[in-house]
Amino acid sequence: MEILAPSSYFSSSSWFLEESRSTTRWTAAENKAFENALAVFDENTPNRWERVAERVPGKTVGDVMRQYKELEDDVSSIEAGFVPVPGYSTSSPFTLEWGSGHGFDGFKQSYGTGGRKSSSGRPSEQERKKGVPWTEEEHKLFLMGLKKYGKGDWRNISRNFVITRTPTQVASHAQKYFIRQLSGGKDKRRASIHDITTVNLSDNQTPSPDNKKPPSSPDHSMAQQQTSSTSIHKLPFQWDQTSNETIMGFASSGHHGNMFQSNPFGMNSYGFKMQGQQMQRGGFCDTYLGSQNMAFQMQSGLHFPNA
């Protein structure tokens, strides 16, 4: 729910005109208290600015109204594309890197050249308009940003986590989320994304771009198999001769001295078996391809005496 008020409201407000000349600096703590108060008192709250000013010690009604106007201008500039938002790459719309750091320090986003965002990675205007419901993924990103930046820092949560939502939309979503949690189980006749309270990074990591690549072509797969098979020529091998067949086996480095030999018919547990028709003067070749071992079985139609 959008909570931005029209600009005309500020121009006609006596509070804003009377104290427009005062210039005060806002600390990080004051900004958090201010944005947290915005999440509590929406635009339909009577005497909204007086109540917001009460939540920010040392600030007057005119101060909080002017700060809100500046916030509104920032949001408008971001949506118009005048302010570059970090987190976009010129090659990939959105890239996540999960490091080994503690907490959310391992959560990084790629940056494009000069901090510019690509046109393909920019959220559509429809996604930022009023009335578009939040998705479960957006809510999880909101929880991650809430844990990193805390309550009130809606601007950083919007810029670095929920990039498809404006800071005011994040503040409004936070208001609904906290009201849902404070209800203590009441009025929960139907499920809501606001019931999701934690995000487990080990279970909910965003898939890396490598996992989203399309399946490789058969030629590419064959090239990979040929590359991997080149490492087998140095592995130890064994010869085993029986009355009617000769078997050459390759053992992996973890299983020296072992030869994997299977039934000539049916399915092998280490791979798929391809069997040809035995001819009178010919033979058939069984090939086994497994994750760790490779064996070739050749049986000839001719009989050789045992040594």
UniProtKB/Swiss-Prot annotation:
The keyword Cell membrane does not apply. InterPro entries: Homeodomain-like_sf, Myb_dom, Myb_dom_plants, SANT/Myb, SANT_dom. Its main location: nucleus. Residues 109-133, 196-231 are annotated as: Disordered. Residues 21-74 form the SANT domain. It is found in: Nucleus. GO terms for biological process: determination of dorsal/ventral asymmetry; flower development. One of its GO terms (cellular component) is nucleus. Disulfide bonds: none annotated. Residues 196-206, 222-231 have a biased composition (Polar residues). Transmembrane segments: none annotated. Residues 126-182 form the HTH myb-type domain. GO terms for molecular function: DNA binding. Involved in the dorsovental asymmetry of flowers. Promotes ventral identity. This is Transcription factor DIVARICATA. The gene is DIVARICATA.
